[in-house]
Each structure stands twice: as C-alpha cells, then as structure tokens.
Amino acid sequence: MKNKGKIIQILGPIVDVKFNENQLPKLLNALTIEFEKTKITLEVAQHIGNDVVRTIAMSSTEGLVRNLEVIDTEAPISVPVGKNVLSHMFNVIGENIDNQSIDPNTEKWSIHRKAPSYEEQTATSEILETGIKVIDLLVPYVKGGKIGLFGGAGVGKTVLVQELINNIAVHHGGLSVFAGVGERTREGNDLYYEMKASGVLDKTALVFGQMNEPPGARMRVALSGLTMAEYFRDELNQDVLLFIDNIFRFTQAGSEVSALLGRMPSAVGYQPTLATEMGQLQERITSTRKGSITSIQAVYVPADDLTDPAPATTFIHLDAQTVLDRNIASLGIYPAIDPLASASRMLSADIVGEEHYKIAREVQRILQKFKELQDIIAILGMDELSDEDKNIVYRARKIRNFLSQPFHVAEKFSGIKGTFVKLSDTLRSFRDILDGKYDDLDESAFLYVGTIEEAKQKHLKNYKGDHVEK
C-alpha cells in the first residue's frame, strides 16, 4: 500500500506535507501530487517534527491547495539513462520535453549518487585539442578534467560554450550531455536546432531547467544531466563530454532554497552549505578506470568579482580556469579570454612539451610587460619608450589581436567564416611572431584570422587596397 500524506502549508516552492505517524518518507525521496491532469514532483528536504516533512517543488506550485493528497514514491528523483536518451531533451525529473516519445522501459537511475571511490578514480594528462588558439596555447584543457569559463554578463561565455560543443563534439565524435541550468530558454532552443543541423544531436542528450523554473528544478537539473553522463561512463565505458551552462545558477538556486528553508545565510547572503553542495556535484565529475567525463562549465561572475563566494568556491575544483575579461571584449577582441588571469594545471613542460611551454610562457611574458608599460604610454606616449620596449609593445599588440579568432557559431553575427586551428599551426604561428618574422605586418592583419598565413594574406589585401585608393 502506498504511503500517503496531505499538504498542510504552501510557501511558494516550499510545500509542507503531513504523514501518518512512523511513516515519514526518507530525506531526498520524491513525492508526487496529481491534480487537474497535472503531476507535480516534490523532493523531501527536511523533517520538521510532528510527522511533517518540508519539501521543494520541481515545478510551479500554482493551483495547489491544502489537504491535497501526496504520494511517497519511496525513491529519489530518477531520470532515464542509456542510449535511448540520445537526441532527446529532458526536464529535471527526466520527462521528455521535445514531443518525441522514448521507450517507456528505459532504465532509470537516481540523481543522487555517491562519487567514485579513490580506488576507482584514475589520473590523466591527455590534452584535449579545442581548435581555439588562445585556449590550446595558454590554457590547455585535459581530457577527463573540469574546465571553468568565468565571466560577467555579456562577455561571451555561452558563445564560447557553443563553439566548444561544435569543435570538440564534432571532432571527438563521442557522446555529450548538455545541462542548461537557469539560463535563457531561447538559447536552449537555438542550441537544440544548431545541434540538429550539425548532426551532433544523435550523440547528445540535453537536460534543461531554465531561469523561468522554480529554484528546486534549477538546483537539481545539473545532477540530472550528470547522472546521464555517469551511466555512459560507468556502464558503456565511454569518454563523455558534459557541458553545464551555468554553474552559478545552480548555486543561486541553492541560495534561494536555503532561504526558503529558513537556514541562516553566510557570506554575501549565500547558503551556509555552499561548499558542500558544490563538492557533491563536482566530485562526481571525474575519470574512472571505465571511462571519463570531461566537464566544461560556464560560471557567471557577479559584478565581475572573482572573489565572490560562488565563483571562488567553483575555482578550487577545476583543472583549468578560463577567465573572460570585459576590457578585452570592449576592444572588440573575441573570445575575450584574459591570457594572464587564465590558468591550467596542464601548462607544464612535462605534459605539453618543452617547446609549447616555452612559447606559452614567452607570450605571457610579453603581454605582462605590455600591461606594465600601458600606464607609461598613457601619460608620456610611445616616444618615451626605449627601442626594446617599443618592440615589445608592437609585438604584444599583434599577439593580442592574433589571440582573437572567428567562431563557427558566430558566423551569422560576424559574417566571418569560423576556423578550427590545429595546435601545431598555433605553435608555429606564435613562434614566428615571437621571433620577429612578422614585425613588418600591420597589427590589424592579425585580427580575426586563423593561421599566420591568413594574416599575411589579409595584410597584402589591405596593402593593395590602400595603394589602389591612393
């Protein structure tokens, strides 16, 4: 016989349910309410005494009234897993939302799972080539690692995530899971049709809990997507790509739920359990002896402040931090990745090789020197610099421009054809710039090109155009 209770209080997305004595559902159990042809799922968050449980709703609670019947499913929220989920779109509780049915007998897994043990985990140092120059050169990504894309509003996080999906998913050919956490529904819709057009959708599962949904859904949707990825890793022995946009919204939803549950807020109003919740999610994203999950996570930075507790808590879990900078975006250089603030534990001579390491460090040295000279240039002008410093400034500007790149996913905005640049071409191009082989080229020729050959062609084209005009 099913364990049943009744609603006794509704406070927005928080619903209190009273059960019979000694029949309380376990913490994290899913409860269901059926009324007016709709089904609402709740998750048990607290036992508050007097046989009452406090729950978080996974969808809107509009229309609910007290004394409605609630049924304990006697299990946590479960989502479908396996090959049947590929090419489909789901919500937080695993319901198909793309109007295409999937096999009702598809296996389901609980979204709350333990992280792999130390014995099961494995370390890897295989580099993941992205085809994006600034990333491959200065912030190399590791296969099976966790990568964060940090940036404030409007600096290009989502476009960068979509380009990485295009480049890595198309070129690596494995399985991918995309979790849309608290972001714009329009972007999720665009992504679905772009994936369909590029032929990647057949190898991808999409899970969405967008910004119009209650905090419960936004807090759990990342776990739903991760569970699907874990199945591919553990049962099918696959190397999986997991894209999460945006991990900050996961934290934000947790903060909303925490306040509604009556917990005392901690620093800057965040939930006191911030580090625990982040750890429970991030520790499950790892490589095991069976397969790997490579995770690329967009992280919104409130007010461009990287010391804010939400991005700061995310930082410690990542293998590579790609920081997008508003000042670089304001120069019209995209991707607006800050080459000095971004870092990767893979940028070591033992992993990427001596040549790559030396080129990357020399590029960073020149850009750092350029940054130091900017105050002098602003006050005294270029004429007061030594010849050596002038040379550094000219090369740094070329390097800064050459770190830009036309994206495939931005073709419709920019009108410039996107490029995938091989690592060997990236290293060769930057080595030649550092050696002074292209000191005679105009710095504008380096903007939005793929390889150095394209920069030479652009320079010649500009040079001829100038002469024709004269």
From Swiss-Prot:
Q: Does the keyword Cell wall biogenesis/degradation apply?
A: no
State a single Gene Ontology molecular function.
ATP binding
Alphabetically sorted, this entry's keywords are: ATP synthesis, ATP-binding, Cell membrane, CF(1), Hydrogen ion transport, Ion transport, Membrane, Nucleotide-binding, Translocase, Transport
Write down the top EC class of this protein: translocase
Q: List GO terms (cellular component aspect).
A: plasma membrane; proton-transporting ATP synthase complex
EC annotation from Swiss-Prot or TrEMBL: 7.1.2.2
Reactions the enzyme catalyzes: ATP + H2O + 4 H(+)(in) = ADP + phosphate + 5 H(+)(out)
In its keyword annotation, does this UniProt entry include Oxidoreductase?
no
Q: Which residues form a coiled coil?
A: none
**Where would you say this protein principally sits, based on its record?**
membrane
CDD domains, sorted: ATP-synt_F1_beta_C (cd18110), ATP-synt_F1_beta_N (cd18115), F1-ATPase_beta_CD (cd01133)
Its localization reads:
Cell membrane
Q: How does it sit in the membrane?
A: Peripheral membrane protein
**Known InterPro entries for this protein?**
AAA+_ATPase, ATP-synt_VA_C, ATP_synth_F1_bsu, ATPase_a/bsu_AS, ATPase_alpha/beta_chains, ATPase_F1/V1/A1_a/bsu_N, ATPase_F1/V1/A1_a/bsu_N_sf, ATPase_F1/V1/A1_a/bsu_nucl-bd
Residues noted as binding ATP in the record, renumbered to the chain: 151-158
- SUPFAM superfamilies, sorted: C-terminal domain of alpha and beta subunits of F1 ATP synthase (SSF47917), N-terminal domain of alpha and beta subunits of F1 ATP synthase (SSF50615), P-loop containing nucleoside triphosphate hydrolases (SSF52540)
* UniProt cross-references to Pfam families, sorted A to Z: ATP-synt_ab, ATP-synt_ab_N, ATP-synt_VA_C
Query: What family classification does the UniProt entry report for this protein?
Result: Belongs to the ATPase alpha/beta chains family.
* Function according to Swiss-Prot or TrEMBL: Produces ATP from ADP in the presence of a proton gradient across the membrane. The catalytic sites are hosted primarily by the beta subunits.
Subunit composition and interactions: F-type ATPases have 2 components, CF(1) - the catalytic core - and CF(0) - the membrane proton channel. CF(1) has five subunits: alpha(3), beta(3), gamma(1), delta(1), epsilon(1). CF(0) has three main subunits: a(1), b(2) and c(9-12). The alpha and beta chains form an alternating ring which encloses part of the gamma chain. CF(1) is attached to CF(0) by a central stalk formed by the gamma and epsilon chains, while a peripheral stalk is formed by the delta and b chains.
Q: What is this protein called?
A: ATP synthase subunit beta
Q: Could you tell me which species this protein originates from?
A: Mycoplasma mobile (strain ATCC 43663 / 163K / NCTC 11711)
- High-level lineage: Bacteria, Bacillati, Mycoplasmatota, Mycoplasmoidales, Metamycoplasmataceae
